[in-house]
Design a protein with these regions (language model features):
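Short pre-active-site segment immediately N-terminal to the catalytic Zn-binding motif
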Residues: 22-39
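Catalytic Zn2+-binding segment of zinc metalloproteases
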Residues: 34-36, 45-61, 74-77
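Single conserved hydrophobic/aromatic residue that forms the stacking wall/gate
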Residues: 1-6, 10-11
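Active-site His/Glu-centered metal-binding helix of metallohydrolases
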Residues: 10, 41-53, 109, 113
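Catalytic and substrate-binding regions of cell-wall glycan-acting enzymes that process beta-1,4-linked
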Residues: 141-164
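Short helix/loop segments within enzyme catalytic domains
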Residues: 84-148, 174-177
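Extracytoplasmic
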Residues: 7-8, 16-20, 32-34, 112, ...
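Membrane-active amphipathic alpha-helices enriched in small hydrophobic residues
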Residues: 58-77, 86-98
Length: 178
């Protein structure tokens, strides 16, 4: 199920648990055309097909268990301040060292699979690079270092997408329906 959500101020799209997809109308400024919109939709469909939200929830539960084990191993003897500091530190290190790299990997996987889905559907996947160039321009001066982000940087995305484009066009041509 896909929905177009009315918010010109929000340049965003997302796949929610259960595979529901939302594209905010502000994203249409970046996609510019049907090939661009197909790239965005393909990316979000890839998140649903690959069950990325389930993977993230599972990984989060495992990390939460790890922080609870710390509490058990210390016998609950840490002061509230030390306990909170320890939990916050573990949470931050887990986010930066485990969750962020994991979700960046999922984003790259969704980029790749989304390009395949779009190509099979007959859309021009060369538009994907143009979307990321526009996103890079839109976010100029607002982006954070990649290691702090759940998403690859625009530069890394553009590089990977350019590496994949010709291969995908050759290996996954549009499906002919007769």
């Amino acid at each position: 199920v896909a929905s177009l959500v009315g918010s010109e101020m929000c340049i965003r799209d997302r796949c929610m648990p259960g595979g529901k997809i939302a594209v905010y109308t502000g994203m249409l400024e970046v996609t510019k055309n049907t090939n661009g919109l197909a790239a965005v939709m393909g990316h979000e469909i890839a998140h649903a097909v690959a069950k990325h939200s389930v993977e993230r929830a599972s990984r989060g539960a495992i990390l939460n268990t790890g922080t609870q084990l710390l509490d058990i191993f210390t016998g609950g003897k840490l002061s509230q301040v030390n306990r909170a500091t320890g939990m916050d530190t573990i949470g931050l290190l887990s986010q930066l060292g485990i969750m962020n790299p994991f979700t960046r990997k999922q984003e790259s996987e969704a980029d790749y699979l989304g390009m395949i889905f779009s190509s099979l559907s007959g859309y021009d996947i060369r538009e994907t690079t143009k979307i990321w160039e526009r996103m890079k321009e839109f976010n100029k001066g607002k982006s954070q270092p990649e290691f702090l982000s759940t998403h690859p940087s625009a530069d890394n995305r553009i590089k990977k997408i350019n590496e994949w484009t010709n291969k995908i066009i050759l290996e996954y041509p549009p499906i002919k329906i007769s």
